[in-house]
Amino acid sequence: LSERWIFLDLDGPVLDVSARYHRVHQDVVQRHGGWPLPRAIYWEAKRNLVAETEILIRCGLSTEAAREAEAQRRLEIERPDHLKLDEPWPWMADVFDELLDLGRLGLVTLRQHRDRLDRQLNALGLHLFFREVVAGPGDGTPEAKAALLRRSGISWGPGSVLVGDTEVDVASGRALGLRTVALGCGIRTPALLAPWSPEALFEDLRQVPSWLEGGERT
């Protein structure tokens, strides 16, 4: 009998990645002679889906320099020294304990470098909580994320759920027949997530265990 799986996206739901994103922003903007945005302003722009090149132009870069800086940003966003800036949300250990009582935990993330991901998970002690880690490069589409899970060989049972912080997570979960939960603590605002009609929309993972338990009682 297939068990219930709770699949979590890493960046946003589990990790606060705003420091890493802002550090890379600072580096590439300064390299091209621009003026980086303050962290709060930069992160709010990212959460509101402002294009990276538009952000870079606001920082004083020419269109050509912005394109170059965006290419450099993509190369550097998973650099090991940058990944060290990521931090689990302070409540994660307690939430993991609650979730593990409700199903098997799987991590699903689009990352270009599996070796760097594994080192990061080990350094943060997160590898201990996940039965499976499903990761691979992607083009940022729901199809790419859904394909990762399809190829994983995991057989999930009724009530399994995908928890993420982007429209890609909601759409990929729906394509796989999973329940979908969107969280507003990551790289999208709740206002941008709501039109994608996730089954539930919460501020962060702390609300998910009670929601899953409520589903068990109905």
Question: How should these model regions be labeled?
Answer:
Residues 2-90, 100:
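N-terminal helical cap/lid subdomain that shapes the substrate entry/recognition surface
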Residues 13, 20, 113, 168, ...:
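Conserved Rossmann-like nucleotide-cofactor binding loop
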Residues 35, 127-131, 199-202:
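Conserved H-loop
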Residues 80-107, 115-118, 143-146:
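Short, acidic loop-to-helix structural element flanking the phosphoryl-transfer center
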Residues 87-91, 112, 165, 185-188, ...:
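Short beta->alpha linker loops
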Residues 101-103, 154-159, 215:
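Glycine-rich phosphate-binding loop signature in dinucleotide/nucleotide-binding domains
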Residues 110-161, 167-171, 175, 192:
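Substrate-recognition "cap/lid" segment bordering the active-site pocket of phosphatases
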Residues 162-202:
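Acidic, Mg2+-coordinating phosphoryl-transfer loop and its flanking beta/alpha structural elements
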